[in-house]
Amino acid sequence: HRNKFEKRGFDRVIDVWGADHHGHVHRLQSALDALGLDGSHRLEIVLMQLVRMMQGGEVVRMSKRTGKSLTLSDLLDEIPVDAARYFFNSRAAETQMEFDLDLAVKQDSDNPLYYCQYAHARICSLLRKMEEEGVTVPEQADLTVLSEEEELALVKQISLLPEEIIGAAADRDPSRLNKYAVALCAQFHRFYNACRIKEAEDEVRDARLVLCRAARQTIYNVLIMIGVEAPEHM
């Protein structure tokens, strides 16, 4: 840490530790204070609660003493990389996580990652089909024609992304992006089920297509920030 502050010019250092090391936080900050590096203010330590693995509704028992453990390599033999990244990012640091191995591989709406990736693929499919049927998906449209409750709610949800990014960074809580992604996809599905697109008048249809494009791009952006793929086909 001294090297980071003195030699490498860091203004602030953020360490991520397991909660079982909480007793060392004050010691390290005090040591940096003694070196004149203002560790109490410039060193921030985020304590992560431990993860409890679940499978078949039961806890997967692990023990350092007996040597029974589950490594990340072992985990990735059981579930996709995307699932590991999404689920590990789905809880705030101070919240204990129950990692459901069965849920992580489910391919239905119970799995939040599948739910979000499916929403992205669904919009991609919709836009492709419109183009195949001779309907040009416009870059811009008059969005003032959107007046349905589900349309306006989707517009509002899309607009919240910058605020969520800033909040996630300020709170050191990237799980906010997971929650936002699920809320956005849920709102898109409500919009899609309530508002006809192909059969609508041209002006309304174009506005709804632009809204779909905006939703797709926003879902894509969030999934990429979380570190998972945004598939166009599922």
What positions do the PLM features span?
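Non-catalytic interaction-recognition regions
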Residues: H1-M234
